[in-house]
Amino acid sequence: MKKFLTVLILLLLTAAVIGYFIYPTISDQLGRRRDAEIMAVYREKTAARDAGGKTELFEQAKAWNDSLEQVRTDDVFTAGMIRTSRDYQNRMNVHDGVIGELVIPAIRLSLPIWHLSTETPATRKLVHVNTSSLPADGTGESIILAGPGILQAEGIPGEMGLTDDRMLEDLDSMIPGTLIILNVTDRTMVYRVTGIQMLSAAGLKEMDLTPGEGEERLTIISPRKDRRLMVQAERIPVREARTLLAEEDQATFPENWKNVLFLGCPVMIAGLLVLLIIELIRGRVYRMPGEQSTEDMETQEETGKKTEQNPDRIEEVEEQ
């Protein structure tokens, strides 16, 4: 019974260790699937709108942008519960608060863009900051998006230090020239990174992001401990972006190896541990009372052979 409990404890410990290591990767993949499902519904609802309905969305967004005198942003990650107006939340609202989609091919990122609200804060979602321009596909826009780097798990997994989605974690690896794509309804807006910097929360608040005449800017902000990573980009023509994306596709090596390592290594270690446990179990076979082991049977066979080969020796022993 003790041997059985030992094996059971080893199996449970192995499962716990494997789960600890692969939980973030599995959770991230499930999060990506949820985001893909959200965007699939978004595209369906976009396709269901006629041309007039789509144009009206952009006109509403442009009216919002015209009402902005200056583009600044508070630190939306520490500002507590942020309430936004119903008027803001109704603009560009195609599906359940989703404005569009952020795509960064260089880091394999694709995320829905939500309206900033109490239900969708910047600490949990990639959001549009309501003090900036909405993506109206026009000139003089300065769009600000904000979201977490790594989404902390909720409940007990979060208390254990486990994470859920890897959202804007890889923004650090971007360089000037990296392309960023915004898909809003049936329109595509492409931006090229011009600068990446790390700021304090106070420094971020002091930044004046108001666009100049004819400028079209995109800013993405993500927290890094007590600092704020800020990526700034300028809009470029879609035709130019297609050429650059084609060049990136030819030069980019697949980055799925990260997931292979995160999933493959724990599985391989688990397999080795299971094989070790099986060998231990095979070496300690449980037998019923009176049941002979294989080793005992082999010993008896060897003794019988020796008896047949030396019968005189046995008789001498018996006479003594």
Residue ranges and their predicted role:
Residues 266-267:
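Contiguous transmembrane helix-bundle modules in multi-pass membrane proteins
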Residues 285-320:
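Cytoplasmic C-terminal tails of single-pass
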Residues 3-263, 279-291:
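Solvent-exposed, non-transmembrane regions of membrane-associated and secreted proteins
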